[in-house]
């Protein structure tokens, strides 16, 4: 089983509703795989709430005007598409707006029921003159993505009920880029930078967490085909600080002989953590790695209180995740013979 360094995810808040998320280091190619999957999921699959239909007192359809109101019904509907709401209810709920002119009608004039919140109360809806009056009923529903007014139209819908386009997604924009990052001597690992903008209804970190949960659930279906299938094991991070430091040491610090060092490096073993994840037979299978090299490695590990995986008190790969943490770049020439 291959052991990879456990990636870390950090958040860099830019504003209340914009954050950058940095995931590194990733195996080459995984930056684009994960970045594209997260972006598409964030934009299409995060649940939210939106107005799906309205009813205005004295209005039968959207192609008309309301006496005393500057904006026609089409303009009012266009403004309502920018309303940011959240709802705790799975079923549709009603909100009401009643305003007498003169004055400006904003989202702050809406009276939402318990469990529903308007997040942009400053949003402009309409302008009333001294004789103007606006009474409106809005239906709020939960959903995902975008639903057109035609899809929101219900069979047998009452006269005066006007369906509108609904933008449920609380995520406004997502971009990502992949940079190269260095892990010891290798410079081809991926660094994923995800930039997320959200509406006031949700924080970027909560949106990313929701997208991650959705993807885990979906990819879990593939894993269930064979729970014993081999893959890259990220391994849990050791909790003991001293042990974590020992496992992160580059094998250069073991002061091995030239032959042993070069054999391990060619096999892709760069840290003590990766070394203790191998069995004695794994090492014997390495070309030019003989019994004397095995004894040398076992002695060096014993001096640190560690052992190979199959030894008494040895380590399981799941708990010995390698961590590359050195810039050592030694090029040895094999001259010693066994």
UniProtKB/Swiss-Prot annotation:
Q: Which InterPro entries match?
A: DNA-dir_RNA_pol_insert, DNA-dir_RNA_pol_RpoA/D/Rpb3, DNA-dir_RpoA, RBP11-like, RNAP_asu_C, RNApol_insert_sf
**Record's family?**
Belongs to the RNA polymerase alpha chain family.
Organism in which the protein naturally occurs: Thermobifida fusca (strain YX)
Question: What does UniProt say about this protein's domains?
Answer: The N-terminal domain is essential for RNAP assembly and basal transcription, whereas the C-terminal domain is involved in interaction with transcriptional regulators and with upstream promoter elements.
Q: How does it assemble?
A: Homodimer. The RNAP catalytic core consists of 2 alpha, 1 beta, 1 beta' and 1 omega subunit. When a sigma factor is associated with the core the holoenzyme is formed, which can initiate transcription.
List the protein's name: DNA-directed RNA polymerase subunit alpha
Spans annotated as Alpha N-terminal domain (alpha-NTD): 1-226
Q: Where is this region: Alpha C-terminal domain (alpha-CTD)?
A: 241-338
